[in-house]
Amino acid sequence: MAIEQEHRKKASGWAARDSSGVLSPFNFYRRETGEKDVTFKVLYCGICHSDLHMVKNEWGFSTYPLVPGHEIVGEVTEVGSKVQKFKVGDRVGVGCIVGSCRSCENCTDHLENYCPKQILTYGAKYYDGSTTYGGYSDIMVADEHFIVRIPDNLPLDGAAPLLCAGITTYSPLRYFGLDKPGMHVGVVGLGGLGHVAVKFAKAMGVKVTVISTSPKKEEEALKHLGADSFLVSRDQDQMQAAIGTMDGIIDTVSAQHPLLPLIGLLNSHGKLVMVGAPEKPLELPVFPLLMGRKMVAGSGIGGMKETQEMIDFAARHNITADIEVIPIDYLNTAMERLVKADVRYRFVIDIGNTLKVRS
């Protein structure tokens, strides 16, 4: 049963009303702070490429009105009576999920991101039937279990994208054992995901090669992000020279691209981990996998324990996303630029200073 409006908090944000993807101001309600809930004032929210897919219903399950945003950071304004981890004034964040069953094998293993009953931060339904709205809004209410603490030395705007892009790349580096000093890891694509993958891998002591279709990104990869080497994936001579040299590859690309050349870069027992989500199936040649016991795997965000671990690791190593901070009324232009990959490397909305809240 939906909660009555008089028992909800008024909220203001920006929403898409249909698959045109155009966003505009939208007033709505969030639930009151429950006994295990944390309410916080949203200060910044990153724009993820999945937000673009969702506002345009490109994955086919969007519902409208849709308030996007799952890279949400801010300051706690209220806590429930049974909240133990947070207090008013704490710097906090919410990523891609705001609920799970908390009892299945995945949940008990701190893998809420793989719970069959996970609740996405926006465009989903809470167990009471109410709609989840994301971080393009002035306030957020969530169970404390799905909230992470942002250390004081991390700037909130640069930390916001870590709640999606950061954990999406950190988790496979850890899980697939590609975090050992001296290992050689490739990162395919130098965008919102790829640039933080390079930063995390380098902080772990890993040798990093960036693999890109664009020769223009070489200087950025080597001099700014600190990668050890750079491969132009369309340069057959470069790719041939690197065959069999990598322990693993994190593939962040969401566009159509061939996997065979990437598999060739792996050494025996090497792992190609897909974290991008192309709209159409990719062709997977099996024979090259057999000839080196190679693996192609996938990874999606991370559980709450690991997300906090990732944020703490980022704080220790001064890792933030490279961002362009925008006012919220620039949102539709930012979405158009995102389609063209015209951002270095993540848009972050300055919610706290630019969102006009309804009276």
Swiss-Prot record:
Entry-linked SUPFAM superfamilies: GroES-like, NAD(P)-binding Rossmann-fold domains
InterPro entries, per database record: ADH-like_C, ADH-like_N, ADH_Zn_CS, CAD-like, GroES-like_sf, NAD(P)-bd_dom_sf, PKS_ER
A GO molecular function held by the record: zinc ion binding
UniProt xrefs under PROSITE patterns: ADH_ZINC
Keywords tagged on the record: Metal-binding, NAD, Oxidoreductase, Zinc
GO biological process assignments: lignin biosynthetic process
Cofactor binding note from Swiss-Prot or TrEMBL: Binds 2 Zn(2+) ions per subunit.
EC main group: oxidoreductase
Reactions catalysed, as given in the entry: D-mannitol + NAD(+) = D-mannose + NADH + H(+)
Enzyme Commission number, as recorded: 1.1.1.255
Binding site for Zn(2+) 2: C101, C104, C107, C115
Required co-factors: Zn(2+)
Top-rank lineage group of the source organism: Eukaryota
Coiled coil region boundaries: none
Binding annotation for Zn(2+) 1: C48, H70, C164
Pfam families reported for this sequence: ADH_N, ADH_zinc_N
Role description: Oxidizes mannitol to mannose. Provides the initial step by which translocated mannitol is committed to central metabolism and, by regulating mannitol pool size, is important in regulating salt tolerance at the cellular level.
Similarity remark: Belongs to the zinc-containing alcohol dehydrogenase family.
PANTHER family: ALDEHYDE REDUCTASE
Protein name from the UniProt record: Probable mannitol dehydrogenase
Organism annotation: Fragaria ananassa (Strawberry)
Lineage, broadest ranks: Eukaryota, Viridiplantae, Streptophyta, Embryophyta, Tracheophyta
